[in-house]
């Protein structure tokens, strides 16, 4: 009982602190009350991202319980066209790859209503949104990140027309802020390279928006990487990410996990500067497995990995032990495996191993090939 009381008191204190900071800092994103709307169609594209230090657990209004860092992918993107019809009753129609999606439209309507204070014109018309992904919807690549990122970019494009243009830096920061309110990790997709979300020792980092990790503090080995996603399971997840985040509220190991993620930023900064691949592999794989350990220690517990996930992980470990080559993995909140390896001269041997030994564990030899180059 005493432990529970201490934990609740701590959470209440943190929440009050976060609320105070949020009131002080969200003011800069409030929209202009004077605007001139018109019929307009805009189009934007936004990539997905894969986290290295994981975000799992949040407070109200998409405030992360710990900071995270991710790679932005180069090819896996969402392309979105947003048509705004001025002065019609507010409504949203959404077409994903040509098919109307009423459930997603309802979600976007709620999202638009929630961000009206930041875009005061947003409820003054009708929207027809057409969106397509360059990757399979259930591939384990975060379509919500690229999807909300693309929508946020479209909204800022419209805001520039209706309310007056902001600087490119200000517009991008506000797009990241707005994307976060739709899907937390979406805020990281607005920037290229390595991206940080959550207040930490990285300069200008914030819980409210993402910032680009300084490229001049990243060793060249980390600027040209592959991410091959093995499609172990393409069906719907048994537990959604939204539910999973919520279960961290009662997870007895949550506080230690949040502390560990913050602590991991120190070693990660040193690793990125030095080019220490061995330590990078160790930290990234540890973060991936910790994410899934949190799921298994939730109440109720749940497991998103499949048999194929574990078979692939064991084969990667055996391959690395036998060859010393830098093939390693990370996982999102699902069964599919992100295979990470640098373009450092060993990639052809690694690709051959993937194709001959790992593809057999996927559904229909499914793999999505991407790169992170910056």
Where does each model-flagged region fall?
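Leucine-biased recognition of intrinsically disordered, low-complexity hydrophobic segments
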Residues: 4-5, 17
